[in-house]
C-alpha cells in the first residue's frame, strides 16, 4: 500500500501527540494538528498542546488565531490543504494528529467544504423561531458538520441551519490522490479514565486556572470562554463563584470522561462508514506496533502528493 499521509487519532489522554511526534521524527515528517482548540493562541494548558514534546519536529495549525476568532471546519480544511501542500512540496511526510472527529473527517472523506455566505432572507425567516423550533429544524436538515456547541447558543444555531440548508455549487475534489494510513490508540476504559483524571490534576498543578484568569484579564468574557471546551467552561464557572474548586474538579473530570466516550463513538462510526483504522494498544508499546505495520507499507515517492 502506498500512503502519503500518516494519521494518529484517539480519545483525549490516549497519547496521540507523543506517538505522532515520534513517527514524524523517524520519517522526516511534520505534524498537522487536527484539534479544534489548539488553533488558539494563549490556550495552552487547557487544550493540551504539549509543545515541549515536539522538539525539532515542525508543527502546523497550532497557535494560528487569537481567542475570539470564530475558527471552523471550513477554515481548518483550507489551512490544512495549504500546509499539506507546503510539506509535501519539500519532500516531507505529513502526519495528522488529533481527536476532533469533524476535522479528521473533513480531510479523510475527501469532500471539499465551502464557506457558506450569510443568508439574510433565511435569517429574517428564523428570527421569530423559538430555540426548540430551531433545534427541530436543524435536526430535520440532518447536518453532518456542526459543532455540539451550536445547540447551546441561538446565534450559532441559526448559523448551523444556514450551513445545513446551503446548496453549494460543484467543487473540485479535496486533495485528489490522498492516501492516508490511519493509526488509532486505544486503552481499556478503566485505564483511560485513570489517565484522564491524572492528567487533569497535572494540568491544574501546571496553572490551568491561572491560564483562564489571564485570558479573562485580556478582555475575553467568561461567557465566551465557556465555548472553548470543557476545561475553560468549568474553570470559568469556578472563577465566577458558581462552583467550588472541588466541585469544579469533579464535574470537569466527569465531563472529560463523557467526552472521551463520545470520541470513541465517533471513531467507531468512522469505521462503520469505511474508514480503516489500525488500532494500537496504548498500554503496550504503540510505537513498536506502529513501526511493525509501517515496515510493510510504502510511502509514495517524493513529493508524496502534488494535487
UniProtKB/Swiss-Prot annotation:
HAMAP family: IPP_trans. Keywords: ATP-binding, Magnesium, Nucleotide-binding, Transferase, tRNA processing. Gene3D superfamilies: P-loop containing nucleotide triphosphate hydrolases. Residues 35-38 are annotated as: Interaction with substrate tRNA. InterPro entries: Dimethylallyltransferase, IPT, P-loop_NTPase. Substrate binds at residues 12-17. The record marks 100 as: Interaction with substrate tRNA. Its cofactor is Mg(2+). Belongs to the IPP transferase family. It catalyses: adenosine(37) in tRNA + dimethylallyl diphosphate = N(6)-dimethylallyladenosine(37) in tRNA + diphosphate. Catalyzes the transfer of a dimethylallyl group onto the adenine at position 37 in tRNAs that read codons beginning with uridine, leading to the formation of N6-(dimethylallyl)adenosine (i(6)A). One of its GO terms (biological process) is tRNA modification. Signal peptide: none annotated. Its EC number is 2.5.1.75. GO terms for molecular function: ATP binding; tRNA dimethylallyltransferase activity. Monomer. SUPFAM superfamilies: P-loop containing nucleoside triphosphate hydrolases. This is tRNA dimethylallyltransferase 1. ATP binds at residues 10-17.
